[in-house]
């Protein structure tokens, strides 16, 4: 049975999956291996190789059955997988600067390799989960985590952009002043913008802006007594799930910000689906429904023809990167007639 592999390289762990020509994932849940990325390219790439051997064994296939490998990493990087010369939070070792991680991995494995940044990989997985690998629909994904990632899928293909920065949705400016209850709020993003989506909808937004703002309105709240805003920010979602009024206000503002953003995307792309993923929605079903309802409440009135656009919650969020990377590799293998990976056979 011939397969493709998906490799999601994070800061501390590598997650793997494999998928066959019937679009069946052969690993359920996480299969992780230590990344050791802070020790530089040579050690990290060896870790990727070693972990892949374990993944194929778990899936019950051979390494020779893998016809292509999809890789995703945090950015910034070019569309072809050349990491930024300035490095990043996850690639602090000087050896990573300007490093061609996709090309080098392909040479080491002796197999073709594709590349996506982690946000685009997650978006491709969300698209596949709804439409399948070969359908030509358009979707917009917003992945709410420490920052705000995501991607744009048009006709089934990831929009990478000229320099690999396509789908940097977190830095789209939104008219946040129209969100009820935010008068006087000054959401500053780490990128230098004021009022982009990430500054209103992310864990960083909760820590830097939303929690301090709402603690001023709820001066006796238990989170204000912790004395550590970083620790307190991580507790907001759990309290919101349990109907804490202040924490629900915080998540309501985040949802309304997403509604404004999605409205812009509807007017720009007229997509078939909107998808939200990440830690904000890795919760119970009741809270997910409430959050989606608040997103819709934040969207201005749509044209009658567009008013029924679905808003989906991305499934299997912890494996989204590896699965999206694998789907990219599967598309590449099919387009280049590698192996026997048509939808009619494995």
Stretches found by the model and what they are:
Residues 13, 265, 269-298:
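Glycine-rich phosphate-binding loops at beta-strand->alpha-helix junctions
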């Amino acid at each position: 049975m011939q397969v493709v592999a998906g490799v999601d390289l994070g800061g501390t762990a590598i997650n793997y999956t494999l998928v066959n020509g019937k679009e069946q994932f052969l690993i359920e849940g996480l299969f992780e291996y230590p990344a050791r990325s802070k020790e530089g390219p040579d050690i990290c790439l060896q870790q990727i190789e070693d972990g892949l051997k374990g993944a194929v064994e778990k899936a019950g296939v051979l390494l020779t059955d893998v016809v292509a490998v999809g890789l995703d990493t945090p950015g910034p990087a070019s569309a072809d997988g050349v990491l930024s010369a300035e490095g990043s939070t996850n690639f602090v070792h000087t050896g990573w600067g300007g490093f061609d991680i996709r090309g080098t991995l392909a040479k080491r494995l002796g197999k073709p390799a594709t590349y996506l940044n982690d946000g685009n990989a997650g978006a491709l997985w969300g698209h596949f989960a709804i439409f399948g690998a070969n359908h030509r629909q358009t979707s917009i994904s917003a992945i709410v985590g420490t920052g705000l990632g995501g991607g744009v899928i048009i006709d089934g293909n990831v929009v990478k952009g000229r320099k690999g920065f396509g789908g940097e949705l977190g830095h789209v400016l939104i008219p946040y002043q129209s969100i009820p209850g935010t008068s006087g709020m000054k959401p500053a993003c780490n990128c230098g913008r004021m009022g982009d989506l990430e500054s209103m909808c992310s864990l960083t937004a909760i820590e830097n802006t939303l929690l301090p703002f709402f603690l001023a309105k709820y001066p006796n709240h238990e989170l204000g007594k912790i004395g550590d805003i970083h620790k307190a920010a991580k507790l907001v979602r759990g309290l919101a799930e349990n109907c804490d009024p202040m924490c629900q206000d915080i998540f309501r503002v985040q949802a309304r910000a997403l509604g404004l953003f999605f409205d812009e995307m509807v007017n720009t792309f007229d997509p078939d689906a909107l998808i939200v993923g990440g830690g904000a929605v890795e919760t119970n079903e009741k809270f997910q429904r409430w959050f989606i309802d608040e997103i819709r409440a934040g969207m201005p009135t749509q044209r009658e023809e567009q008013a029924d656009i679905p808003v989906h919650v991305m499934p299997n969020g912890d494996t989204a990167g590896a699965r999206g990377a694998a789907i990219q590799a599967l598309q590449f293998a099919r387009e280049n007639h590698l192996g026997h990976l048509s939808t009619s056979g494995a």
